[in-house]
UniProtKB/Swiss-Prot annotation:
Keywords on record: Ribonucleoprotein, Ribosomal protein, RNA-binding, rRNA-binding
Gene3D superfamilies, sorted: 3.30.160.810, Translation factors
Transmembrane segments: none
Family membership noted in the UniProt record: Belongs to the universal ribosomal protein uL3 family.
GO BP terms in the entry: translation
Presence of the UniProt keyword Cytoplasm in the record: no
Known function: One of the primary rRNA binding proteins, it binds directly near the 3'-end of the 23S rRNA, where it nucleates assembly of the 50S subunit.
Domain of life, source organism: Bacteria
SUPFAM superfamilies, A to Z: Translation proteins (SSF50447)
UniProt-listed InterPro entries: Ribosomal_uL3, Ribosomal_uL3_bac/org-type, Ribosomal_uL3_CS, Transl_B-barrel_sf
GO CC annotations on file: cytosolic large ribosomal subunit
Organism for this UniProt entry: Geobacter sp. (strain M21)
Protein name: Large ribosomal subunit protein uL3
NCBIfam families linked: L3_bact (TIGR03625)
Length: 211
């Protein structure tokens, strides 16, 4: 993976292809991002760059943040993400990465935070079937038995149970770049991506693009 940047999800719309097909797309305001750090195999054990998005008032940043971004010479940022690279020689501190880094037809992976839906039961959270609604049934939406008694006398880890639904890191793979508006730093991606409007997402080359 050698391309990527941070963006902000604006919402979904639809466009028409040249053959008349209607395509649902997600509009992402991609960048401009600034390279604030480079990592090398010799020093850090892997090769990567760190990019920042969204200017932040220096008076609201601590000394560590200011010092971290000093080498880039572009101020302090609100959001930071790291991009693994095969080779970082093409990037220098302070370089600006914009939407034009991607082209129409590219396949990308998009990572974001899914919409939080609060505490949910097993039917909504995991898709359990549930029990009968009538005929004397006293079992409707409960999870039922969650383990054995004497052996093993415990509940196994990762048991599907009620709990927090959403608000977790989600990656959608192999989305197609339908259109790129370099003037306004907009990227139109085919399909849906995680998160709500104005949510921060990471767009990078698809790891399965060549498969």
């Amino acid at each position: 993976m050698n391309k990527g940047l941070i963006g902000k999800k604006l919402g979904m719309t639809q466009i028409f292809a040249e053959d008349g097909r209607r395509i649902a797309v997600t509009v992402v305001e991609a960048g401009p991002c600034v390279v604030v750090q480079k990592k090398s195999v010799a020093k850090d054990g892997y090769s990567a760059i760190q990019v920042g998005l969204g200017a932040k008032d220096a008076s609201r940043a601590n000394a560590a943040q200011i010092g971290h971004c000093k080498g880039a010479g572009a101020g302090v940022f609100t959001h930071y993400r790291e991009l693994r690279m095969d080779n970082t020689d093409a990037y220098n501190l302070g370089d600006v990465i914009e939407a034009a880094v991607f082209e129409e037809g590219d396949l990308v992976d998009v990572t974001g935070t899914s919409i939080g839906k609060g505490f949910a039961g097993v039917i909504k959270r995991w898709g359990f079937k549930g029990g009968r609604s009538s005929h004397g049934s006293r079992f409707h939406r409960a999870p039922g038995s969650i383990g054995c008694s004497a052996t093993p006398s415990r509940v196994f880890k990762n048991k599907k149970m009620p709990g927090q639904l959403g608000n977790e890191k989600v990656t959608v793979q192999r989305l197609k770049v339908v259109r790129v508006d370099a003037a306004d730093n907009l990227i139109l991606l085919g399909g849906a991506i995680p998160g709500s409007a104005n949510g921060v997402v990471l767009i990078k080359d698809s790891v399965k693009a060549k498969k």
